[in-house]
Structures are given as C-alpha cells and as structure tokens.
C-alpha cells in the first residue's frame, strides 16, 4: 500500500508492509527499525541535491533520542556531494546528544568521501562499519567495555 503525504516542503510517499514502513523522498527509500542495541536507518536508492534536505529532516528524528544509531547506506546507488551535508549534520547532532552512531557506506558514498572509508574504520571522517551486523557487534562490545569499567566501582561501594 502506498500513501502520499504532503509536507511543508514536498510530498513523500509511504509504502507500508506489516511492521515496517518505507518513506520515499524523490528516489530515496528510508526504512527504520529499532534493534535492541540501536536504531537502524536504511536508505536505498539515490541521495542528491533535490532530496537531501528532506532526507536529513527525516533521519535527524532518529538521532534525537538516547539510542545509538546505525545509518545504513550500503544499498545507495547514487550519493552526490550534497549528501555529505546529511552525514555532517547527523554527526554533529549525535555528538551534541552524546549518541553513538555508525555509518555503513556503499561504494558511491565511499567515492564521495574521497575513498577514505576503505582505509580502515579509524581513519574515516565519520564512525564507519563494514556492515550493519559489524556496527551492532561493535556497539555490543562498547557496552561490554563500559560495564567492565563500572563493575569494580559497584563492588567497592557494596
């Protein structure tokens, strides 16, 4: 089922399936779901100057909470230079809110970022992961490390 929803700047269409709706902004389909470790936002299709503002608005909603976020762009077929603003805004929002996030990039995204993503996850402009599975695994590891730091403090106070 597809429904067109008018917004203040443009119209988007929403395609629903049981339990998960995809929102379409001019060639980019956005789907989000809550995993127990993070909110995973997947964007397929194309991000360009014509739709990046609407996509940014939609994606920013998921960075305003306290849940970590994985932005999955692995299935993007086109990512213009205008899309970098989406990543910069998301990075700023997450840093300001203290929310951990990770980017899963397609070859089109890697190309726009100057190929820096394939040099390793620690040398890129943004927090990178090779897959959603790897991003969620890294988040689980980070939670375990924080727990290990806190456990000695708890046992001392008891």
From Swiss-Prot:
The gene is OprA. Keywords: Phosphoprotein, Stress response. The keyword Phosphoprotein applies. This is Osmosensory protein A. Induction: Highly up-regulated by osmotic stress. Also induced during oxidative and starvation stresses. SUPFAM superfamilies: SpoIIaa-like. The keyword Phosphoprotein applies. Part of a signaling pathway that enables adaptation to osmotic stress through cell wall remodeling and virulence factor production. Unphosphorylated OprA forms a complex with the anti-anti-sigma-factor paralog Rv2638 that dissociates on OprA phosphorylation by PknD. Phosphorylation of OprA may stimulate the release of SigF from an inhibitory complex and enable the transcription of osmotically regulated genes, such as oprA and the ESX-1-associated virulence factor espA. Residues 28-139 form the STAS domain. Regulated by PknD under osmotic stress. It comes from Mycobacterium tuberculosis (strain ATCC 25618 / H37Rv). The modification Phosphothreonine is found at residue 2. Phosphorylated on Thr-2 by the serine/threonine-protein kinase PknD. Also phosphorylated to a lesser extent by PknB and PknE. Dephosphorylated by PstP. Disruption phenotype: Disruption of the gene enhances resistance to osmotic stress, increases resistance to several peptidoglycan biosynthesis inhibitors, decreases peptidoglycan thickness, enhances antibiotic resistance and activates genes in the SigF regulon. Interacts with Rv2638. Phosphorylation abolishes binding to Rv2638. The lineage of its organism: Bacteria, Bacillati, Actinomycetota, Actinomycetes, Mycobacteriales. Belongs to the anti-sigma-factor antagonist family. It holds the Pfam family STAS.
